[in-house]
């Protein structure tokens, strides 16, 4: 039986890419019975009479799975945040990073619209960028008006499945249009009333760019820490994870425990204050979450 990867799911059809091309398939009823929904990114077994009539027979085990957006087997996330319009938002970036780290997906931070910033804003954004690089993250500066700045992203996309995510209105679709001009993905200007863009992407689709596949997702419609527990959170902050091994108490939450290495690192300036503040904010949010039964 042939195998392939689902690159688009739309109106009950699954578009499976394989060695011979792309075949439009439906899911077998057994999937509904077993409460399995094939996802974009799934590696599958299928059978087909022709390119327009096929059936997905089996879904292979996933290495990870996102719910919103619904996509599986993601290698890395390109997190696009603008320097201005809307202004750079480290709190929202950290929220994305936690969600991505929790799913064992490699994050790459891409800061767009650097051509629009004044000098004070440039210095502030570059300072944040240096902080994130010290934490071990790749940080790229891009502008859709300077195509060569987008080109630096291409090597990161090779031989892997990437999701492009980030704040609405920061230029995700514009960036993909530069990488693949034939796409002509819809873009929206920023609403001056809201200071943010409207989502312009309506379904998840994997797009070929070089030897890689990139998902232009409809954005993360939920940024809540639904599945994350307090004890997971430390491991989603690389610099906290590094210091936490020196805490006196195993399972230290780095809030009120004595001889906490994380708090000591914050006081000594080895962990950025804003990162620790975001960590505390997220702990509070998780603790206030209504229990699920």
Curated annotation (Swiss-Prot):
Gene Ontology BP, a term: ribosomal small subunit biogenesis
Pfam families: RsgA_GTPase, RsgA_N
Ligand binding (Zn(2+)): 247, 252, 254, 260
Listed InterPro entries: G_CP_dom, NA-bd_OB-fold, P-loop_NTPase, Ribosome_biogen_GTPase_RsgA, RsgA_GTPase_dom, RsgA_N
Documented EC number(s): 3.6.1.-
Matches recorded under SUPFAM superfamilies: Nucleic acid-binding proteins, P-loop containing nucleoside triphosphate hydrolases
Subcellular location as annotated: Cytoplasm
The keyword S-adenosyl-L-methionine appears for this protein: no
PANTHER family: SMALL RIBOSOMAL SUBUNIT BIOGENESIS GTPASE RSGA, SMALL RIBOSOMAL SUBUNIT BIOGENESIS GTPASE RSGA 1, MITOCHONDRIAL-RELATED
The protein's assembly and partners: Monomer. Associates with 30S ribosomal subunit, binds 16S rRNA.
Name of the protein in question: Small ribosomal subunit biogenesis GTPase RsgA
Gene: rsgA
